[in-house]
């Protein structure tokens, strides 16, 4: 009998000692699952929010990209326009420089070519006087000798001027040329074609291809 009571007490003690353990495990299991579910919900919410923010940021990013592209295109257009203006400005400056250099060269060549023009212009009145004097006819031997000396001087001056490119303009018998001749009279003359120089009153001269003084002439009608 005592053995049965002892066994019954031991069994009760064992049950009291072992009974709470399953309840604690269940509590632990319940307590362990709740945070996991909460974490999953939070993660899903974060993903959803991130997707929404990404969708919201996408138009902004596209707009910023479009703005940057438009700004780059505008800058490129300004650069091309400025390059074109600079190119045109360079071409104008280059053309102006070339024109200046050409004019300078022409002026220097003209100055060298016609350097005797001033001297020739000053000598023309003296040549006219020589020509008028040499037309004088005289029987006086002394006067003839003087005229011969004057003619020698006159020829020497003409030779010197010829070396510088000075020559008399042909007039009598030539068609009238307003660039070479100055008509002071017109006459009817059957011996000449109309508009032909029939008489020269004063010699004309030119230096190379430049007329220093036109010939003063009479022209047939």
Swiss-Prot record:
Residues 23-32 have a biased composition (Basic and acidic residues). It is found in: Cytoplasm. Keywords: Chaperone, Cytoplasm, Stress response. Its main location: cytoplasm. GO terms for biological process: protein folding. NCBIfam families: PRK14140.1 (NF010738). Homodimer. This is Protein GrpE.
